[in-house]
């Protein structure tokens, strides 16, 4: 058997390429999903990178993606790898502008964590801060654009978005003072 025949018969090679071309992914997630050894995954990633079939971005995570994706889409994917940022984005996509305290209650994340996520999303110009006395509310600037990016970068979330239901806390939580 020639080397070419061996390569084409290897299911890991095609699986890795198809997975990366269908949606961006991290190296470790790719190893987990493909159920191939990490050395094998690394080998085929190197081959696909040399052939310019895929691209990668190294940062906190090693992100592998299709060359068809725009840098802004990869930047958004990298942002939503953070669970708190992802929770805030999904809640704000599904709702009207909310205050920080409402986001804390809905997402069940800590106040400092929500604060960091909001600061990051404001800096990236994904959300807008509305100043309303006595508090501010936050909303997504362009929901349709953000949702189209979500469809390209995280199709599982996008396809199941209608099933995602917000469990709003009772308004009394924000109004009562506990002794």
Per-range role (PLM):
Residues 1-3, 28-32, 36-74:
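Long, low-complexity, charged/polar intrinsically disordered regions in eukaryotic proteins
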Residues 8-13, 22, 26-30:
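N-terminal accessory/assembly segment that mediates macromolecular interactions
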Residues 24, 61, 135-137:
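A generic structural signal for beta-strand entry/edge sites
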């Amino acid at each position: 058997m020639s080397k070419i025949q061996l390569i084409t018969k290897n299911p890991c090679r095609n699986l890795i390429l198809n997975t990366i071309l269908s949606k961006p992914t991290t190296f470790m997630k790719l190893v987990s999903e493909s159920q191939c050894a990490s050395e094998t995954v690394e080998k085929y990633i190197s081959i696909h990178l040399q052939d310019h079939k895929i691209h990668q971005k190294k940062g906190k995570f090693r992100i592998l993606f299709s060359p068809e994706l725009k840098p802004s889409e990869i930047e958004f994917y990298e942002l939503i790898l953070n669970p708190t940022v992802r929770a805030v984005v999904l809640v704000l996509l599904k709702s009207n502008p909310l205050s920080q305290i409402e986001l804390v209650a809905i997402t069940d994340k800590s106040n400092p964590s929500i604060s960091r996520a909001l600061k990051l999303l404001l800096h990236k110009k994904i959300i807008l801060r509305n100043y309303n006395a006595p508090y501010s509310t936050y909303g997504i600037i362009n929901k349709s654009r953000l949702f189209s990016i979500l469809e390209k970068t995280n199709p599982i979330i996008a396809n199941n978005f209608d099933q995602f239901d917000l469990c709003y806390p009772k308004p009394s939580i924000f109004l009562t003072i506990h002794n």
